[in-house]
């Protein structure tokens, strides 16, 4: 995988503008992961940081089930009910993805609400191996 960054500002924010992945034989398209437990019940009301952490745990579990991990993530879509609060906690993404040596391209969108009331953060991913 080769990073494509015509400018360096996104690198400072922890993501690449694009990545070229050659020879990928398998792709996994992950549904949005949120801060829910194994029964699908929302967790950590009003705690953006805890919700981001649990959503990342759930993303890792889905990837593991597909025989992949965060190092395989090629693109992220992120939805937050409070973009400023989410950005304050983006160090969590940096720690998780940084430990795998990747900074996948991402889009962050502010939304009025997510599908389940009380959820503040959702992350979806495309992974390739």
Language-model segments: what does each one mean?
Residues 1-57, 61-75, 80-129:
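N-terminal presequence-like segments and the immediate start of the first folded domain
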